């Protein structure tokens, strides 16, 4: 089967009146075939990455006798976060993922019941895969921490995530309010060390302000 692109343009006389039509047919069979091949490869890549992540999750679950339940759930949550953002890459043929979609995806478990508890505000920003994965894991860790000890752990707690990009830098600000009193932990947890390392690898910075009325986390990343 041949795929044809047809363009029709009006033909006008000297007075500007339409007296006919010009039709141009182009054979775009190869172009269409290439697009379908790319789409197939993208779906296959998604399938393989999901299988790999599923295998890792299964391995963690099988280590039940050796791995504490809390650690196991934490690892599974991070793996699921990566799987979610990988699904977004397929939609853009691995160009990247939209920041708003990542944020909505990561915070959905905490905002579905009562959307006033979570506010997301920022312009459209397409993040390349490496940066998108870093942001996804970071938001996952912040949300998990807030659900355990912060604003998302109490009925009236609120979280606001805002961002803007300028001069090749993405600035994110995570603000918790109306939650339980918090203070800076004596020791950094594994999750905190993970996101600090990931952000540093992207030549970015992260700052935690442990206010009594709620955590403020500010992140700067090159995009």
Q: Where are the predicted features?
A:
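PAS-family sensory domains
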Residues: 7-9, 17-27
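Sensory coupling linkers of modular signal transduction proteins
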Residues: 15, 26-41, 45
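Conserved short strand/loop->alpha-helix "switch" segment adjacent to the catalytic nucleotide/phosphoryl-transfer site
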Residues: 36-42, 111-157, 186
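Short acidic helix/loop segment immediately C-terminal to the autophosphorylated histidine
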Residues: 60-72, 93
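Short beta-to-alpha transition helix within the HATPase_c
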Residues: 73-80, 84, 88, 95-112, ...
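Short beta-strand/loop element within the Bergerat-fold HATPase_c
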Residues: 156-168
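ATP phosphate-binding glycine-rich loop and adjacent ATP-lid/helix-beta elements
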Residues: 181-209
């Amino acid at each position: 089967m041949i795929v044809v692109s047809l363009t029709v343009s009006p033909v006008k006389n000297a007075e500007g009146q339409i007296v006919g039509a010009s039709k141009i047919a182009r054979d775009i069979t190869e172009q269409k075939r290439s697009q379908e091949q790319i789409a197939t490869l993208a779906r296959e890549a998604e399938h393989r990455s999901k299988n790999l992540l599923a295998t890792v999750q299964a391995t963690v679950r099988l280590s039940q006798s050796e791995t504490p339940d809390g650690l196991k759930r934490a690892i599974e949550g991070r793996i699921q976060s990566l799987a979610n953002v990988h699904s977004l890459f397929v939609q853009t043929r691995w160009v990247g993922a939209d920041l708003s979609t990542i944020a909505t995806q990561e915070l959905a478990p905490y905002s579905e019941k009562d959307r006033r508890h979570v506010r997301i505000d920022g312009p459209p920003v397409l993040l390349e895969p490496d940066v998108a994965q870093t942001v996804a894991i970071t938001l996952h860790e912040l949300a998990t921490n807030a659900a355990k000890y912060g604003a998302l752990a109490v009925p009236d707690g609120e979280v606001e995530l805002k961002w803007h990009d300028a001069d090749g830098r993405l600035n994110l600000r995570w603000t918790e309010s109306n939650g339980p009193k918090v203070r800076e932990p004596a020791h950094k947890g594994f999750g905190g060390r993970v996101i600090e390392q990931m952000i540093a690898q992207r030549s970015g910075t992260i700052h935690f302000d442990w206010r009594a009325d709620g955590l403020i986390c500010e992140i700067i990343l090159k995009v």
